[in-house]
Design a protein with these regions (language model features):
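N-terminal beta-strand motif that seeds the catalytic metal site of vicinal oxygen chelate
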Residues: 1-19, 81-84, 141-181, 191, ...
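Core segments of cupin and vicinal oxygen chelate
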Residues: 3-57, 100, 109-115, 123-126, ...
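Short helix/loop capping segments that flank catalytic or ligand/cofactor-binding pockets
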Residues: 23, 95-96, 132-135, 142-144, ...
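A cross-kingdom feature marking solvent-exposed beta-strand/loop segments within repeated
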Residues: 33-47, 64-88, 92-121, 152-160, ...
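Conserved oxyanion/phosphate-binding beta-strand-loop segments in alpha/beta enzyme cores
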Residues: 49-68, 136-151
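Internal, well-ordered alpha/beta segment that forms a basic, Gly-enriched binding/recognition surface
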Residues: 113-156
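Short, structured patches in soluble enzyme cores that scaffold and shape functional sites
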Residues: 136, 169-174, 196, 226
Length: 262
């Protein structure tokens, strides 16, 4: 049986400078600043800016000390995606089911509370250093999560027509694609949607293999790529070398008018 996932909840990036990243996503992509956590809200060791456009929620998080785990992550990988958070009915059940089926725990279930209600969260590990956090928020009406305060952009956001997250692509090592596809099938109950081989996706110089897995309602889609032989280094191999591990290659977002958006 699949782990019941309703949709994406948010995507969290670990970055070197959260404020500058937030300004970039607001200015270039028209995201709206909706929430904040940092020293001003009582969080001493890290700072997070929460941005939204349509149904897409991005969290940009930076460390405030060089010893912090987030600083280590940024030092090794550069800016990148740490958490692909999934919106669920029952975070504890989703977590327990995943663990029983062989997933590795990243964060045991916690309940966060403030004047807006409660949110339950738990997380498992996937490829590279990436996490999936299960977020149960049916009893919450705050701006984002307990611990965050509502914020507004200093200047009005100019949305560019981004509507929702279509898919999130993972790049994994040669020979690891089937292992991670099996992980999503066995642990999360995802279905294999489509397979691309190097004949489908290649240029004269670079090639890749890809399999796409999807949850029950089709809202959450994860293509998993691995390198394939080409005349030159595969773009997937190139990513693995630069990022120093498997990780999220790109996030695809939907728009009704791609020319206007671009």
């Amino acid at each position: 049986l699949p782990v019941k996932i309703l949709d994406y909840d948010h995507i969290e990036f670990y970055v070197g400078n959260a404020k500058q990243s937030a300004l970039y996503y607001q200015a270039a992509f028209g995201y709206e600043w909706i929430a904040y956590r940092g020293p001003e809200t009582g969080c001493r060791d890290k700072v997070s800016y929460v941005l939204r456009q349509g149904k897409i929620t991005l969290v940009l998080t930076a460390a405030l000390s060089p010893e912090h785990e987030i600083a280590r992550h940024v030092h090794l990988h550069g800016d990148g995606v740490k958490v692909l958070a999934l919106w669920v009915d029952d975070a504890e059940k989703a977590f327990q089911t995943a663990i029983e089926r062989g997933a590795e725990a990243a964060m045991k279930p916690v309940t966060l509370e403030d004047e807006h209600g409660t949110v339950k969260m738990a997380a498992i590990k996937t490829y590279g250093e990436t996490w999936h956090t299960f977020v149960e928020r049916s009893d919450y009406d705050g701006p984002f999560l307990p611990g965050f305060e509502a914020r507004r952009s200093a200047y009005p956001a100019k949305p560019v027509g981004l509507k929702f997250v279509d898919h999130c692509v993972g790049n994994v090592e040669l020979g690891a694609m089937n292992k991670w596809v099996k992980f999503y099938q066995d642990v999360m109950g995802f279905k294999l949607l489509i397979t691309f081989d190097d004949k489908d996706i290649s240029t004269e110089y670079t090639a890749l293999m890809s399999k796409v897995v999807s949850n029950g309602n089709g809202y959450v889609k994860f293509p998993i790529n691995e390198p394939a032989q080409g005349k030159k280094k595969s773009q997937i191999e190139e990513y693995l070398d630069f990022y120093r591990s498997a990780g999220v290659q790109h996030i695809a977002v939907a728009t009704d008018d791609i020319i206007r958006t671009v």
